[in-house]
Amino acid sequence: MSASQDSRSRDNGPDGMEPEGVIESNWNEIVDSFDDMNLSESLLRGIYAYGFEKPSAIQQRAILPCIKGYDVIAQAQSGTGKTATFAISILQQIELDLKATQALVLAPTRELAQQIQKVVMALGDYMGASCHACIGGTNVRAEVQKLQMEAPHIIVGTPGRVFDMLNRRYLSPKYIKMFVLDEADEMLSRGFKDQIYDIFQKLNSNTQVVLLSATMPSDVLEVTKKFMRDPIRILVKKEELTLEGIRQFYINVEREEWKLDTLCDLYETLTITQAVIFINTRRKVDWLTEKMHARDFTASAMHGDMDQKERDVIMREFRSGSSRVLITTDLLARGIDVQQVSLVINYDLPTNRENYIHRIGRGGRFGRKGVAINMVTEEDKRTLRDIETFYNTSIEEMPLNVADLI
């Protein structure tokens, strides 16, 4: 059933998700049931089997224009169902009888690409759709064989490997009709902008373009003008972007060298189901992990210097719960859905304030409550105030009873 945009409903999504911030949109159709989206029966079965009951606010607004073929810029908080928004749209549009790649999804990290692939496969479970993760760090020959022998309906990948496969003509753009950029702010930042543009040049001029992300600074919106045609905009106001359901605190540590003792004190105070500790450099991740192990605290480490197999093992252990604390760089801050994470510790405040929401979004996804604790030295106080202003939020000093909140 559709309603006008003016009603600006704040319905709960799957699993009692907290209401999302009001979405600003130039699209006036809100469809509050998957049954009313004219989706195929087999796709609907996959959606309900996956555990969705009702579309989240972003899904109510963005799925329909995506299916209708419009270029779409969709913005919503982490954990509100952005991945399923484009996965459902792709699965509805592909022709299963056509054994050719028809949709291309790009993600900034290998882990996120693999997670998107899993969501697509799960939602399309009853359709027989094929989806392949085309990522760096894996065997090129096996990749080429897969693309040539099978031509999967959907490719999810990282920019470097995808461009390589397109450039060497192992991946054909001939039938690609939908191009999705997930975590678009990261993808279009300095590191990936040129690669994205090169990939886009190889696609058909009438290819539909969909961008999704939690943050979309104005310079990114400028870049989208280069390769999007009158896009539908579905945006959350900036001041409503910080996550509801996440309690945010800071600990005053004055000096950098006191952070380690403070972290160990926290460990002893809290019963942690699962936690992610964010640090700004790879070298410091290794340093902190060693220091924690020396003090008999268990923790796993993950960063971009590790090879893909090692990263896969660490993520598997963390997802299964056999490892409870993960120390990482911003590599993990982009959309990795680890359901049990109740606590995020920013050992270092992010150097880019827009990464803050990606980091603390690890706790409280789909309405699960979470706590974020920021370790703040004298030098960090200005950065903390800057984050508070940017997100129009309040980060309070950590109370003594923090253990009761996790």
Swiss-Prot record:
The modification N-acetylserine is found at S2. Its EC number is 3.6.4.13. A motif (DEAD box) lies at residues 182-185. CDD domains: DEADc_EIF4AII_EIF4AI_DDX2 (cd18046), SF2_C_DEAD (cd18787). One of its GO terms (biological process) is positive regulation of transcription by RNA polymerase II. SUPFAM superfamilies: P-loop containing nucleoside triphosphate hydrolases (SSF52540). A motif (Q motif) lies at residues 32-60. ATP binds at A76, Q77, S78, G79, T80, G81, K82, T83. It catalyses: ATP + H2O = ADP + phosphate + H(+). The modification Phosphothreonine is found at T158. There is a cross-link at K146, K225, K238, K309, K369, K381 (Glycyl lysine isopeptide (Lys-Gly) (interchain with G-Cter in SUMO2)). The keyword Membrane applies. GO terms for molecular function: ATP binding; ATP hydrolysis activity; RNA binding; RNA helicase activity; translation initiation factor activity. It holds the Pfam family DEAD. Residues 63-234 form the Helicase ATP-binding domain. One of its GO terms (cellular component) is nuclear stress granule. Its main location: cytoplasm. It is found in: Cytoplasm, Perinuclear region; Cell membrane; Cytoplasm, Stress granule. Keywords: Acetylation, ATP-binding, Cell membrane, Cytoplasm, Helicase, Hydrolase, Initiation factor, Isopeptide bond, Membrane, Nucleotide-binding, Phosphoprotein, Protein biosynthesis, RNA-binding, Ubl conjugation. Gene3D superfamilies: P-loop containing nucleotide triphosphate hydrolases (3.40.50.300). Residues 245-406 form the Helicase C-terminal domain. Residues 1-21 are annotated as: Disordered. The modification N6-acetyllysine is found at K118, K174, K193, K238. eIF4F is a multi-subunit complex, the composition of which varies with external and internal environmental conditions. It is composed of at least EIF4A, EIF4E and EIF4G1/EIF4G3. Interacts with PAIP1, EIF4E and UPF2. Found in a complex with XPO7, EIF4A1, ARHGAP1, VPS26A, VPS29, VPS35 and SFN. May interact with NOM1. Interacts with PDCD4; this interferes with the interaction between EIF4A and EIF4G. Interacts with RBM4. Interacts with DDX3X in an RNA-independent manner. Belongs to the DEAD box helicase family. eIF4A subfamily. This is Eukaryotic initiation factor 4A-I. It comes from Macaca fascicularis (Crab-eating macaque). The gene is EIF4A1.
